[in-house]
C-alpha cells in the first residue's frame, strides 16, 4: 500500500513553523509496517491544496492530510476536499455536538466561528477528536482513501493512532514487517563509514543500509523488511552483528541511546564519581552530564573557569604555567583537571581549555585548538585536538569528544575491574 502525506499551512511554507507532523506520521506508520512514499507541503491556497491532493492520489492509495481544519478564514481544507469530490459542504451534526460539549467542558459557549469546524463534505465520515475542537474526516475518491486531520501535533497524533492507523491496517491482507537497528558512530568520516559497511546490505533479502549525519555523529541505520516477522528479526540480528564487527571501536551507542545516556549508565555501573573544569565549553559538558536524571549520584562538581584569575583562584593553576604556556595548553589542562579532582574529591576529573573562536587563534594555536586532560588515581593524561567549524560547532564537538573520552575511560576501568 502506497501512502503519502500532505501538510497544509502558510506558516510551514514561510518557515515560521517546523513541520513535525509529517515526520511523526511516517515514523508511526513505519512502526506498523508501512512506508510513506511521498511527502508534500503547500500553503493555504485552495488551488494548491486541490492540485496537491489530486496529484498524490494518482500515485498513492492513501493520502493523509494535516492542517487547515481550524475556525479561521485561512482554514480552507474542508472546502478544498469538497471541491475535489464534487460534494457540498454540510454541517455534520455529530461534529457540532462534540464542539458544543467541548466548549461546555471548558466552561464557555461555542463561538459562532467554531461552527465552521463542523462543516465537511457530504460524503465524508467523521474522525473524532478526543483532545481538541477540530474534528477530522475521511472519504474515498477514485478508489483512494483521503484522511483529513488537524494540524495541531497532539490532536493529530491521537487521531492518527485511534482511527487512521487501525483503518489502514484493516485494509491490508498480507502485512509487511519492518524492523530497524541504529548504530551511532563517532570518529570516521561518512565516506569511511560507508566503506566499512560495504557488503552488509542485501537487497535480495530485504536488508538495506542508510547513513544519516547528525553532527558530530554518524548514524548507520539497518532496515529489514519482509512478510515473516521471525525471519525479519533474524535477518536484522545477523546484519547487526556484521555491522557491529565492521564498525568495531567507533560505535558509542545503539538505537535510542545517546553518548550522554551511555556515559551515565557507565558511571552508575562502575560507581566512580566525576568533577569537571571547563573553559571554552562554558559548562556545556556539565550540562550534558546533568541533563540525565540521577546524575547527582556520580557528578560531584563542575567549575567554569573562563578567566586566568578564576583558574588560579579556584583550581590552583600556577600563574607561572599561564604566563609561560598560555591558558590553552596541555600543561594548564592538566593543572585544571588535577585541581578539580583535588577540590571535589572525585575519582575522575576532566578539564577542557581551548579556542572556540571566531577570534583568539594564532599560527601555533589556530581557532579550534582544544586541550583536554583526564585525571584519575593513576595520574593525568592530556590530549590536543584541532577542530573545524564555527564557534558553536567547535564547542559542540569538544563537549562530544569529552563525553566520548569519559566513555572510553570508564569502559577501560570496568574491564580492569572484571580482570582483577
Curated annotation (Swiss-Prot):
It comes from the Bacteria. It holds the Pfam family CinA. Belongs to the CinA family. NCBIfam families: cinA_nterm (TIGR00200), PncC_domain (TIGR00199), PRK00549.1 (NF001813). This is CinA-like protein. It comes from Geotalea uraniireducens (strain Rf4) (Geobacter uraniireducens). The lineage of its organism: Bacteria, Pseudomonadati, Thermodesulfobacteriota, Desulfuromonadia, Geobacterales.
Amino acid at each position: 500500500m502506497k501512502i503519502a502525506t500532505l501538510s497544509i499551512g502558510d506558516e510551514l511554507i514561510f518557515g515560521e513553523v517546523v513541520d513535525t507532523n509529517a515526520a511523526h506520521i511516517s515514523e508511526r506508520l513505519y512502526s506498523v509496517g508501512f512506508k510513506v512514499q511521498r511527502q508534500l507541503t503547500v500553503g493555504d491556497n485552495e488551488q494548491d491544496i486541490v492540485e496537491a491532493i489530486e496529484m498524490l492520489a494518482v500515485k498513492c492509495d492513501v493520502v493523509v492530510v494535516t492542517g487547515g481544519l481550524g475556525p479561521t478564514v485561512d482554514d480552507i481544507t474542508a472546502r478544498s476536499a469538497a471541491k475535489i469530490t464534487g460534494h457540498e459542504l454540510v454541517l455534520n451534526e455529530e461534529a457540532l455536538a462534540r464542539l458544543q460539549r467541548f466548549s461546555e467542558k471548558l466552561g464557555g459557549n461555542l463561538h459562532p466561528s467554531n461552527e465552521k469546524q463542523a462543516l465537511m463534505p457530504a460524503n465524508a465520515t467523521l474522525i473524532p477528536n478526543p483532545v481538541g475542537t477540530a474534528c477530522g474526516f475521511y472519504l474515498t475518491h477514485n478508489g483512494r482513501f483521503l484522511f483529513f486531520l488537524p494540524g495541531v501535533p497532539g490532536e493529530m497524533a491521537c487521531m492518527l493512532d485511534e482511527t487512521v492507523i487501525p483503518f489502514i491496517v484493516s485494509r491490508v491482507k498480507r502485512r509487511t514487517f519492518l524492523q530497524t537497528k541504529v548504530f551511532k558512530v563517532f570518529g570516521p568520516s561518512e565516506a569511511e563509514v560507508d566503506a566499512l559497511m560495504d557488503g552488509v546490505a542485501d537487497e535480495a533479502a530485504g536488508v538495506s543500509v542508510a547513513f544519516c549525519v547528525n553532527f558530530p555523529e554518524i548514524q548507520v541505520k539497518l532496515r529489514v523488511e519482509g512478510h515473516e516477522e521471525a525471519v525479519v528479526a533474524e535477518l536484522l540480528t545477523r546484519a547487526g552483528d556484521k555491522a557491529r564487527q565492521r564498525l568495531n571501536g567507533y560505535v558509542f551507542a545503539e538505537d535510542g541511546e545517546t553518548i550522554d545516556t551511555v556515559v551515565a549508565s557507565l558511571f552508575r555501573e562502575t560507581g566512580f564519581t566525576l568533577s569537571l573544569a571547563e573553559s571554552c565549553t562554558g559548562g556545556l559538558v556539565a550540562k550534558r552530564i546533568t541533563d540525565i536524571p540521577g546524575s547527582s549520584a556520580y557528578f560531584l562538581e563542575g567549575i567554569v573557569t573562563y578567566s586566568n584569575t578564576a583558574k588560579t583562584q579556584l583550581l590552583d593553576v600556577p600563574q607561572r604555567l599561564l604566563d609561560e604556556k598560555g591558558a590553552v595548553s596541555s600543561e594548564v589542562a592538566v593543572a585544571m583537571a588535577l585541581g578539580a579532582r583535588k577540590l571535589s574529591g572525585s575519582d575522575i576529573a576532566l578539564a577542557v581549555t581551548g579556542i572556540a573562536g571566531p577570534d583568539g587563534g594564532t599560527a601555533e594555536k589556530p581557532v579550534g585548538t582544544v586541550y583536554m586532560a583526564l585525571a584519575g588515581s593513576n595520574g593525568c593524561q592530556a590530549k590536543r585536538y584541532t577542530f573545524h567549524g564555527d564557534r558553536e560547532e567547535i564547542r559542540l564537538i569538544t563537549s562530544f569528544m569529552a563525553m566520548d573520552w569519559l566513555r572510553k575511560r570508564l569502559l577501560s576501568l570496568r574491564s580492569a575491574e572484571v580482570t582483577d
